[in-house]
Amino acid sequence: MKHYVAVDIGASSGRLILGKLVNEKLQLEEIHRFKNGFTYRDGHERWEIDQLMQEIFIGLEKVKQLGILECVLGIDTWGVDYVLIGASGEKLADPISYRDKRTLNAVQNLTSEYPREYIYKKTGIQFMELNTLYQLYVEERDLLERAEKILLIPDYIGYVLTGVKVAETTNSSTTQMLNLREQLFDKDLLSHLNIDVEKFAPLTDAGTYLGKVKEEWLEEYDIPNCDVVTVATHDTASAVVGTPAEGENWAFLSSGTWSLIGMELSAPINNEAAFKENYTNEWGAYGTYRFLKNIMGLWIVQEIARMDDYKHSFAEMAEEASNYPYFKQIINVNDARFNNPENMVDEIKLYCQETGQTIPETIGELTNCVYGSLALYYALELEKMTEITGKKIEKLYIVGGGSNVAMLNQLTAKLAGIEVFAGPSEATAIGNLVVQMINQGEIESMRAGRKIIRNSFEIGEFSCGDVRFEEIKERFTKVLEFN
């Protein structure tokens, strides 16, 4: 029996999950979990990338302690951030987080030189200041000139493990530098940044064998002999692979620190309507495209908890929230002011004050406000998606950590007026494992993998119901007018 390890690292935590296929059912075991985050060093918010590597080795040692001598391994992480590699193969600096303030106004500045419509027509990617395009636009020229290669985070981890440099396509598409038509890094865009296209590794599809873990790591650490497979390395791409969807008329919501809501399509949509609504066409596994909107997620709730010194669990916060009427206060969760404020609670209160609403005071009121606002935003985006694609959405599959928030799932079902299916919460790791198993011939296809997922995990169901959607939508429009 083959053993598979998913290295799944998000913005706030990481985990190594052991998976195997037994009687057409996936069995998972969490082997190691660790915290992730950025710290302010050398003038920027930076990831502790060396510590992440150490956590991976600790996890792999735990795998071997189970008596597993050989395994297959895949890596997925968050998108857009990168590591600059020098001529000798060394890391030039710890990577800067997408939440760093260096890219403030970068979109505006670059698009004043290079029209938005032109960039969108080429790439089909949503305009966000965190995109790699804008990070490189403001990167220190000295570092860029010294860099031989630019590797996104999961590709860097794969490189450290195997010595092989690649640019996996699902994650590379998040950079806003891939040309949709040519299926390559766009030389014209890169030349505008004075970056040679050769600084990027060869584009590689999800499901491609990368290589064996280097001998030096086997000697330094007591870990299994691992074959590394390049999975869908962008965590959302893996989460979509891990979505237990069936049929055609469905949408997905990968709910975690961010909310990524969209549809899986066979061709991109980069027309005027998609451009106007700032939709993105991220590449998916096996020739698909993730037509989606990247919006705020549970980050706001996580920050409320942090400001409260974690006195309440997330379950307790949701329970407290249920004691208040929904939609008493509505915030625009996608407002940039909520990206990384000094104090999230104060920012929400100030927003409500500025928009003529009552100010939420308790932990329950604040949580109620955020969950209601998120559900409203989801429903509005599903409405826009239907208009742009011309496809009727009948089901929404919510995966990731947010699939455990029953209150948010039920509010979304009511506002959107469609059935909502929630789970699995570990869809990203599951999608990672499924791609490995397809590579190894244990699963035939992504469709077959999704059937196995449906048979392996409990999926929650939430029915649509009556709600004052149009009235709430009108109130939200008035709130936006204050801005």
UniProtKB/Swiss-Prot annotation:
UniProt: substrate binding residues: 79, 234-236, 294
Domain of life: Bacteria
UniProt keyword Mitochondrion, yes or no: no
Pathway(s) this gene product operates in, as recorded in its UniProt entry: Carbohydrate degradation; L-rhamnose degradation; glycerone phosphate from L-rhamnose: step 2/3
EC number, UniProt record: 2.7.1.5
A GO molecular function held by the record: glycerol kinase activity
Group of enzyme by EC: transferase
Coiled-coil segments on the chain, per record: none
A cellular component annotation (GO) from this entry: cytosol
GO BP terms in the entry: glycerol metabolic process; rhamnose catabolic process
Family membership: Belongs to the rhamnulokinase family.
NCBIfam families with a match to the protein in the record: rhamnulo_kin (TIGR02627)
Function comment: Involved in the catabolism of L-rhamnose (6-deoxy-L-mannose). Catalyzes the transfer of the gamma-phosphate group from ATP to the 1-hydroxyl group of L-rhamnulose to yield L-rhamnulose 1-phosphate.
Protein name: Rhamnulokinase
The species this protein was found in: Listeria monocytogenes serotype 4a (strain HCC23)
Designated gene of the protein: rhaB
